[in-house]
Regions:
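Catalytic histidine-centered segment of alpha/beta-hydrolase-like enzymes
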Residues: 236-245, 249
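Conserved acidic catalytic loop of the alpha/beta-hydrolase fold
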Residues: 70-88
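Conserved HGGG/HGGXW glycine-rich cap/lid loop of the alpha/beta-hydrolase fold
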Residues: 9-65
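Catalytic histidine neighborhood in serine/cysteine hydrolases
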Residues: 219-239
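Conserved alpha/beta-hydrolase "acid-adjacent" motif
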Residues: 211-217
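Flexible "cap/lid" loop of the alpha/beta hydrolase fold
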Residues: 98-106, 110-141
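Short beta-strand/loop motif that positions the catalytic acidic residue
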Residues: 198, 204-206, 210
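Conserved alpha/beta-hydrolase catalytic His-Asp/Glu region
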Residues: 124-130, 142-196
Length: 257
């Protein structure tokens, strides 16, 4: 497994290689680069596919200190530079979209285009935060219960999602790391008023049944980014790229063509 020493982190990544146009896949909260296996398989013949584990996730390991999605965006841009890639299409699911938008704002030279999957530019409804915080507190204190595991599975993948492999990973997450990565989520800034500054071509893909981020948030993002296109995945949940890979891949392929 390759690693890159970047910004004080030991970033784990996968790279299909070659000198083809690059796609950089950034995963969602509590996930890792393997959530894009279906996309890497579909696109690696025509594109150089890089998928990476963000701070506090997967092979990159626990976050060493508090961080923001601007830090994650800087990690992504630095990873491209480490690999000798000047520009990539940033494909981001949920928090991967958060960092992709911030990369487009802070390092537009590195962002050829953006694909937002189950993501948003604005904030979560305030009434959601106490529930999420209580869940994190219970999880970090008592471990991953059956109830919490089932709740997370439903939020991420919907009722048909097989979350067993992910539960095994979640059970290994430390209490300190859980609080750190959720703090990053809770304290992020609202980008709504900055969307008009984004110049990269943008595709917004969102499921009708996303339990984490309602479709209206994707619609707002698509309306705010100049020229953005919205594709709605019928029956898709939060991680539609996993549960509805075929229509998601079709939307991405048509956007990239």
């Amino acid at each position: 497994m390759p690693y890159a020493a970047i910004n004080g982190q030991n970033i784990h990544y996968t790279d299909s290689g070659g000198d083809k146009p690059a796609l950089l896949f950034s995963h969602g909260l509590l996930m890792d680069c393997s959530m894009f296996d279906a996309q890497v398989s579909a696109f690696s013949n025509a594109y150089r596919c890089i998928a990476w584990d963000e701070r506090g996730h997967g092979g990159t390991g626990d976050a060493r200190e508090n961080f923001s999605y601007y830090d994650s965006a800087a990690d992504a841009v630095a990873l491209l530079a480490y690999l000798g890639i000047k520009q990539a299409v940033f494909v981001g699911m949920s928090q991967g979209g958060y960092l992709s938008l911030r990369a487009a704002l802070t390092a537009p030279h590195a962002v050829r285009a953006i694909v937002l999957l189950g993501s948003q530019a604005d904030m979560d409804a305030p009434e959601k935060i106490p529930g999420y915080q209580a869940m994190v507190d219970a999880w970090s204190t008592h471990g991953l219960s059956e109830e919490i595991g089932s709740t997370i599975e439903h939020i991420i993948g919907g009722p048909s999602f097989d979350g067993a492999p992910w539960r095994a990973k979640w059970k290994k997450m430390s209490a300190t790391n859980l609080h750190t990565i959720f703090n990053t989520l809770f304290t992020r800034d609202d980008l709504t008023d900055r969307l008009s500054q984004i110049t990269a071509p943008t595709l917004v893909v969102h499921g009708t049944d996303d339990a984490a981020i309602p479709l209206v948030h994707a619609q707002k993002a698509a309306q705010g980014i100049p020229g953005a296109k919205l594709v709605v995945i019928q029956g898709g949940g939060h991680a539609a790229n996993m549960t509805h890979a075929a229509p998601v891949n079709k939307a991405i392929a048509e956007f990239l063509a």
